[in-house]
Amino acid sequence: MCKDYVYDIDIEQIAKEEQGEALKLQASTSTEVSQQQCSVPGLGEKYPTWETTKPELELLGHNPRRRRIASSFTIGLRGLINLGNTCFMNCIVQALTHTPILRDFFLSDRHRCEMPSPELCLVCEMSSLFRELYSGNPSPHVPYKLLHLVWIHARHLAGYRQQDAHEFLIAALDVLHRHCKGDDVGKVASNPNHCNCIIDQIFTGGLQSDVTCQACHGVSTTIDPCWDISLDLPGSCTSFWPMSPGRESSLNGESHIPGITTLTDCLRRFTRPEHLGSSAKIKCGSCQSYQESTKQLTMKKLPVVACFHFKRFEHSAKQRRKITTYISFPLELDMTPFMASSKETRVNGQLQLPTNSANNENKYSLFAVVNHQGTLESGHYTSFIRHHRDQWFKCDDAVITKASIKDVLDSEGYLLFYHKQVLEPEPEKVKEMTPQAY
């Protein structure tokens, strides 16, 4: 058995019938059901404890064998119809519906809609979408309701012109985050500046910014929430460092061949100290004078799902172009070197390099990749998703085909989605999942 959560449409129907009978008995004393405003029948309702009836016990007695999930298991693999330049939306939907903990949240009916007009709730529509994609229906799904709600809540994405998949991802997470209020009732967020909805629990990380005064070495620290990390590429207008010569080793599928830039290289650049220069002097809170300073970004808190965005589309005063530089990325990623606790520090004036000991809590596994083919003016989005633990599939709108790991790692890469291998057991947080579960 794969030890994953199971969604069974027959059991779901039995649960609805039992729940209906229970509600009739509780109608005079309970007000719980009347508070539910979700427009989808059976969605977001609180099920009572299932007590088996005599016929059900007889059926269970006649069917004692457990079902074993076959390697050809295809539930969840369903194409999406392109409604007119909507590949940017389809590829993100495939990545989100194959995000393990988000999938389990929606398929377990955890959403409690509190919007005055539930038909405008994007979370309700995503719940319906998850149910459609995991229904076992092999025919492509038409996500017209989702597109309509996106146009309503993110008007800058309205219309049939080409859009950016990364921009859609951030807009979708923002709307889902706003519509999730009510799902975290009674829970206390670990950070008072954040809510504790499923979007924050899965996607929100903490980005630490340290500004160091060059005169007194005083440090000003701020921590901001983030849903993704955008990374500069070689060949862009921003400066990039040359590759270190002689690095020819390979780690978990990430190439280190001279001349090839890796995801790790991009993360090193993202977290290296940056001199702000004389034109950007700031008033130091320690010495109370305007001084030059350095700025360094590191991760204070890692999200459950880490999304990396390569800045392939460059818009400057001189030109608009797409950067096609190949970036090697691994199947497994260790974020320990890029944590605030691992950054370079000075002790008695001497630079101390971090000791990057293995930390399983900071290790991630790749589960989705979004790619863009074509030019800045005319292109097409597709995605690779991991399914049934170690199988990969290419999602090209309505067409889904089997893919190899080599196909995935050789792809250009625009958005990379990594899932934590080990989840820290925290109260009222998302359930712990073993790596085998996704």
UniProtKB/Swiss-Prot annotation:
Active-site residues annotated for this sequence: C87 (nucleophile), H380 (proton acceptor)
Subcellular location: Cytoplasm, Cytosol; Nucleus
InterPro entries: Papain-like_cys_pep_sf (IPR038765), Peptidase_C19_UCH (IPR001394), Ub_carboxyl-term_hydrolase (IPR050185), USP_CS (IPR018200), USP_dom (IPR028889)
Gene source species: Mus musculus (Mouse)
Protein name from the UniProt record: Ubiquitin carboxyl-terminal hydrolase 27
EC number(s) stated in the UniProt entry for this protein: 3.4.19.12
Domain USP: 78-421
CDD domains, sorted: Peptidase_C19D (cd02660)
Pfam families documented for this protein: UCH (PF00443)
